[in-house]
Amino acid sequence: MEFLMKKVVFALSALAVVSTSAFAAESGDGTIKFTGEIVDAPCVVSTDSQNQEVVLGQVKKNIFKAIGDKSSSKPFQIKLEDCDITSNTKVNVSFNGVGDTDDATLVSVNTEAGAATGVGIGIYDNANKLVEMNTGKSTTTLAAGQTVLYYTANYVATKDTVTTGYGNAEVDFNLSYE
């Protein structure tokens, strides 16, 4: 009888361990973050255009021999969707952020440790015209449905001497309609 009792206790102990393991394997938690915005505008910005990263890549220092020298351009776009052009037919886009200290029409690269100096970032519209930081705008005629706004960006030398380092920056874009 004692042997049978030990066998039952062992079986119940094993079952408790297996049950706990199974329960632990099934438990878990997490967080779901919802973001969005309700707007009163002729178009909405496509979700894939709201937060973008434009990779300017590694650029050799020796291409910057004088103020105004540029790296190769990297394209990016802002997609507008569900455009209703019954009351507004044009969109103005401006870019806002920290302007370069030597050329305020350009975006300043971040000044953290290890940052490059002597360069800013230029943003150009589809006609290759510089959209001046904080003061400029590009205007595009809207199409019903979807309108894609095409831009390019590149590094621009703001000093005769450019130092190596990170060339990161961030800007906001703002839309206004007419």
Swiss-Prot record:
The keyword Iron does not apply. Residues 1-24 form the signal peptide. Keywords: Fimbrium, Signal. It holds the Pfam family Fimbrial. InterPro entries: Adhesion_dom_fimbrial (IPR000259), Adhesion_dom_fimbrial_sf (IPR036937), Adhesion_dom_sf (IPR008966), Bact_Fimbrial_Adh_Pro (IPR050263). GO terms for biological process: cell adhesion involved in single-species biofilm formation. One of its GO terms (cellular component) is pilus. It is found in: Fimbrium. The keyword Chaperone does not apply. Belongs to the fimbrial protein family. This is Long polar fimbria protein A.
